[in-house]
Regions:
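Intracellular juxtamembrane helix-capping segments at the cytosolic ends
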Residues: 119-132
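Pair of pore-lining "gating" transmembrane helices in MFS-fold secondary transporters
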Residues: 9-30, 111
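Structural signature of the two symmetry-related core transmembrane helices
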Residues: 81-96, 173-176
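Residue-level signature of mid-helix packing/kink "hotspots" within the transmembrane helices
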Residues: 60-68, 152-153
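Juxtamembrane intracellular "pre-TM" segments in multi-pass secondary transporters
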Residues: 1-16, 197
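Helix-to-loop junctions at the C-terminal end of transmembrane segments
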Residues: 65-78, 163
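Short amphipathic helix-loop junctions that connect adjacent transmembrane helices
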Residues: 33-50
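Paired small-residue
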Residues: 93, 104-112
Length: 197
């Protein structure tokens, strides 16, 4: 009972929940607009559909390939450093996506964005595990999973609202600002400072 009531840094854990949500949010925010966006550059229906599928898959493929290496890097240099760098990388890679001049340009940009996010979920899990009592780890990680599903819901909603109100390119820029804020919060975290980032 004493262990269950042991104090821990809730601000750190909440920041990790937010980050977990935004990792999914960043990938899903373009879903409502991607087909129309690509349709500005391609004119055959089958080509638009195929390219849309490839673009959505590119980020996931990048994450699959980079996750083992990012996880290994985090073990060596620290989870906070890798987390902050990955979030900043994602934010930066969203900017050129708003200014493409041909549909194929989205493929390498989404792939690189996926690579920057690959392995960050294990970083989040490790940070949570190191900051909560052992008897509460399961519950806190459960909330982290719920946060990811919130990102899966809020990402497309956000993209749809922004795209409907201001157009498709601002979806990428607005997502960039959200990810940049999360990266800044992670970088400025007292625990990250204490660990030398």
């Amino acid at each position: 009972l004493g262990e269950a009531a042991a104090p821990f840094d809730r601000a750190i854990v909440r920041l990790m929940w937010l980050t977990a949500m935004l990792l999914v949010f960043a990938n899903m925010s373009i879903e409502p607009v991607i087909t129309l966006y690509i349709g500005q550059f391609l004119h055959q229906e089958h080509a638009i559909i195929l390219m849309s599928g490839l673009v959505m898959a590119a980020a996931a493929l990048g994450s699959i390939l980079s996750a083992p290496f990012v996880g290994k890097l985090a073990d060596r240099v620290g989870h906070w450093r890798v987390l902050s760098a990955g979030l900043f990388g994602c934010a930066l890679l969203l900017i050129p996506q708003a200014f493409i001049t041909d549909a194929w340009q989205l493929l390498p940009l989404r792939f690189l964005m996926g690579m920057s996010l690959g392995g960050l979920m294990p970083c989040i899990t490790a940070i949570i595990r190191h900051n909560v009592p052992a008897v509460q780890v399961g519950r806190m990680l459960g909330y982290s999973t719920s946060a990811q599903y919130i990102g899966q819901v809020s990402g497309p909603l956000f993209g749809g609202v922004i795209g409907g109100a201001w157009g498709m390119r601002p979806v990428f820029l607005a997502t960039c600002m959200v990810m940049g804020l999360c990266a800044w919060l992670s970088w400025r975290s007292p625990r990250a400072k204490a660990q030398g980032r």
